Swiss-Prot record:
InterPro entries: Cucumovirus_coat, Cucumovirus_coat_Asu_sf. It holds the Pfam family Cucumo_coat. Keywords: Acetylation, Capsid protein, Ribonucleoprotein, RNA-binding, T=3 icosahedral capsid protein, Viral nucleoprotein, Virion. It is found in: Virion. Disulfide bonds: none annotated. This is Capsid protein. GO terms for molecular function: RNA binding; structural molecule activity. The modification N-acetylmethionine is found at M1. The N-terminal arginine-rich stretch does not seem to be the major RNA-binding region that allows formation of an infectious ribonucleoprotein complex. Residues 1-28 are annotated as: Disordered. The keyword Ribonucleoprotein applies. Belongs to the cucumovirus capsid protein family.
Length: 218
């Protein structure tokens, strides 16, 4: 046997264990399939618990989804009498509503008190009929129907209440920027009159990126 034949034979000998070991992955494949099924069930369980417009969740700071950015609206409720209500539709700037077909994935609401705040308020984001005038009676009915999960914000002696944010996931609804006028922030001042300078609401609307101007205005 010459040198080339010896080398070829050596290669074949090295390959045989690899070919012979191919029966082993059948067991590994079965284990992998079981693991995949378990992960699939876990994902379904987690998906069921993800926040929606009807079942929001408390959140900390989160990064935007890839390809998305956010537009913030700041609301300062006027004076609200004890046991009364306030509502404001989500009206985005014209520079954003120009792209009304861009999808909206999430709405986050943050409640920040000003120094004078010493009350309890209920806050929610709710889809409201276009015909609604957001009167006290209309808002009261929406809080009373049980379909409006709320963030209860109370006076915190030091700093800001730990759970001061709610996140609403709209991705399954395929909502877009044009739909945002159908949503409103609703506030209920439960125990005390809320003064004009007591509370600030920050509404962050996460939506698909829109073109931005590269030229400064004149």
């Amino acid at each position: 046997m010459d040198k080339s034949e010896s080398t070829s034979a050596g290669r074949n000998r090295r390959r045989r264990p690899r070919r012979g070991s191919r029966s082993a992955p059948s067991s590994a494949d079965a284990n992998f399939r079981v693991l995949s099924q378990q992960l699939s069930r876990l994902n379904k369980t987690l998906a069921a618990g993800r926040p929606t417009i009807n079942h929001p969740t408390f959140v900390g700071s989160e990064r935007c989804k890839p390809g998305y950015t956010f537009t913030s609206i700041t609301l300062k409720p006027p004076k609200i009498d004890r046991g009364s209500y306030y509502g404001k539709r989500l009206l985005l700037p014209d520079s954003v509503t120009e792209y009304d077909k861009k999808l909206v994935s999430r709405i986050q609401i943050r409640v920040n008190p000003l120094p004078k705040f010493d009350s309890t308020v209920w806050v929610t984001v709710r889809k409201v009929p276009a015909s609604s005038d957001l009167s006290v009676a209309a808002i009261s009915a929406m809080f009373a129907d049980g379909a409006s999960p709320v963030l209860v914000y109370q006076y915190a002696a030091f700093g800001v209440q730990a759970n001061n944010k709610l996140l609403y996931d709209l991705s399954a609804m395929r909502a877009d920027i044009g739909d945002m006028r159908k949503y409103a922030v609703l506030v209920y001042s439960k125990d005390d009159a809320l003064e004009t300078d007591e509370l600030v609401l920050h509404v962050d609307i996460e939506h698909q990126r829109i073109p931005t101007s590269r030229v400064l205005p004149v």
